[in-house]
Amino acid sequence: MKITKITSHVLGYDLPETLGYSQQYYKKRTSHIVEVETDEGVTGWGECFGPGNIAFANKGIVEKVIQPIVLGMQALDRDVIWHKVYNLMRDHGQKGMPLQALSGVDIALWDLAGKAANLPLYKMIGGAHRDKVEVYGYGMMLRPENIKSLISRFKEESAEIKEMGFKALKM
């Protein structure tokens, strides 16, 4: 099952307000989805981390750097592919955008392998270590506001998250 094409899809939408976290504020939410196609018609999907315009830079790395390296390779040779790409890109950085782009391709190859084997991924990586996973509520994004307003809003939002039944939250 050979890799025939890799396509990056950058999705985005404008937020109704400016939001932020410890590193930056942003007005648009983006997601970078990677699609790996094979000669047998099996397709795998992955996601690259990279907020904002970083998603477009990662798209270029996936399509212009990684794709030419892996076209024609066996899609099930995930480890071989990962090390080949990593070793060819490592002079350009062992973290950040090159690894974000590689991770999206790697996730897509795992998805593809699970589909080809007709197995869920947890079976392919050694089985289920638990039968449930606790989830957390998410919120309390930064906004351009004064600290007093921020504290008040965080108290309200955390109470709302707790009322929804979450036992933990991420901010």
Where are these regions (language model features)?
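Glycine-rich, aromatic-flanked loop segments that form ligand/cofactor-binding clefts
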Residues: 106-146
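Metal-dependent enolase-superfamily TIM-barrel catalytic cores that perform enediolate-based chemistry
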Residues: 131-171
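Glycine-rich, charged/polar anion/phosphate-binding loops
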Residues: 18-21, 120, 155-156
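Structured beta-strand/loop patches that form or line metal/cofactor-binding pockets in enzymes
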Residues: 1-45, 49-52
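Ligand-binding pocket scaffold of soluble enzyme catalytic domains
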Residues: 34, 45, 77, 116, ...
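Metal- or metallocofactor-binding catalytic centers and their adjacent structured scaffolds
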Residues: 37-116
